[in-house]
C-alpha cells in the first residue's frame, strides 16, 4: 500500500512539473514552433514612407531621417509590441546600427554619417558630377570626402 501511494505521488508530481505555466507558454501552446522571422518595423513619416528605427527616429529614402518630430510619434508604439523588428539595410557602425538611407547609419537612439551606407553614391568619383545628382547625394559626397581627408592626417 505505501508503495502504491508513493508511485501515485511521483506521477502526480511529474504531471504538475511538465505543465505549461502562464508566464512561460509559447504562443500556440507547448508544441508550437518557435517564431524565427523578424518582422519589419512600423511605417512612419509623411504618407508612411519611412520605417521606425527607434522610439523617436523615422527614416526613409524619400524623406531622409526625422528625429523627435511629430511624424515619429507613431514609433513610440514599437516599444509595446512583443515581437522584435528590424529596419534598414545592412549592419553598420560600432553601436549595432543599420543603414537607414544612403550615407546614414541609425540605431534605436541616434544616427550618424557612415561611408559604409553610401551604396551606389560611393561608386561615383568626386569628379564625375552629373546633372541629375540630387542635392542630398552631393552633400553626402562632400561629407564623405571631408571625413576621408581628416582620417588620412
UniProtKB/Swiss-Prot annotation:
Signal sequence, start to end: 1-19
Pfam families named among the record's database cross-references: Hormone_4, Hormone_5
Residues modified as Glycine amide: 28
Post-translational modification: Seven disulfide bonds are present in neurophysin.
UniProt-recorded Gene Ontology molecular function terms: neurohypophyseal hormone activity
Positions of disulphide bridges: 20-25, 41-85, 44-58, 52-75, 59-65, 92-105, 99-117, 106-111
Keywords: Amidation, Cleavage on pair of basic residues, Disulfide bond, Hormone, Secreted, Signal
Function: Vasotocin is probably an antidiuretic hormone.
Name of the molecule in the record: Vasotocin-neurophysin VT 1
Amino acid at each position: 500500500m505505501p508503495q502504491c501511494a508513493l508511485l501515485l505521488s511521483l506521477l502526480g508530481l511529474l504531471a504538475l512539473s511538465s505543465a505549461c505555466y502562464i508566464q512561460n507558454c509559447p504562443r500556440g501552446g507547448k508544441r508550437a514552433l518557435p517564431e524565427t522571422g523578424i518582422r519589419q518595423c512600423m511605417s512612419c513619416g509623411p504618407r508612411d514612407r519611412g520605417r521606425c528605427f527607434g522610439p523617436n527616429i523615422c527614416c526613409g529614402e524619400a524623406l531622409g531621417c526625422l528625429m523627435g518630430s511629430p511624424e515619429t510619434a507613431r514609433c513610440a508604439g514599437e516599444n509595446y509590441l512583443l515581437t522584435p523588428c528590424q529596419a534598414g539595410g545592412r549592419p553598420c557602425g560600432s553601436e549595432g546600427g543599420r543603414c537607414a538611407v544612403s550615407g546614414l547609419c541609425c540605431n534605436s537612439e541616434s544616427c550618424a554619417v557612415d561611408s559604409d551606407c553610401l551604396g551606389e553614391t560611393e561608386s561615383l568619383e568626386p569628379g564625375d558630377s552629373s546633372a541629375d545628382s540630387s542635392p542630398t547625394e552631393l552633400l553626402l559626397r562632400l561629407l564623405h570626402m571631408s571625413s576621408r581627408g581628416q582620417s588620412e592626417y
